[in-house]
A protein has these predicted regions:
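Redox cofactor-anchoring modules in respiratory/redox and cofactor-processing assemblies
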Residues: 1-107
């Protein structure tokens, strides 16, 4: 469990986790080798104000694509837990990034 205060952007926090998971991938299986860097790049787009509804849908698809039973190890499925939870509980924050074309937690 990760606890955030009201000054911390959940999109940015989840993006930081995805960057970590993408960096730690050994590249053996396709979901890790291709999926995690793709997810990381989408989060960088959100942070830069270039996120879109299409990107949001791709992130949702990646939760299933990288989930348990689809990879050699537990790295990508481990990444889907915070990604899936973040999309479920903070979808409005993602949509606000899209609408405002920026992170609303930063001044």
């Amino acid at each position: 469990m990760i606890v955030l205060d009201d000054q911390t952007c959940p999109v940015g926090m989840i993006g930081n986790l995805m960057k970590f998971f993408a960096h730690e991938s050994c590249g053996f299986c396709t979901p890790c080798r291709d999926g995690l860097p793709w997810v990381d790049s989408i989060f960088r787009d959100f942070e830069a104000g270039r996120g879109s509804e299409k990107d949001l849908n791709i992130l949702k698809e990646q939760v299933d694509y990288m989930g348990p039973g689809r990879t050699f190890c537990a790295l990508a499925p481990g990444a889907t837990a915070p990604l899936g939870s973040g999309l479920k509980y903070f979808e409005d924050d993602f949509k606000e990034h899209i609408k405002q074309k920026r992170c609303t937690y930063k001044n």
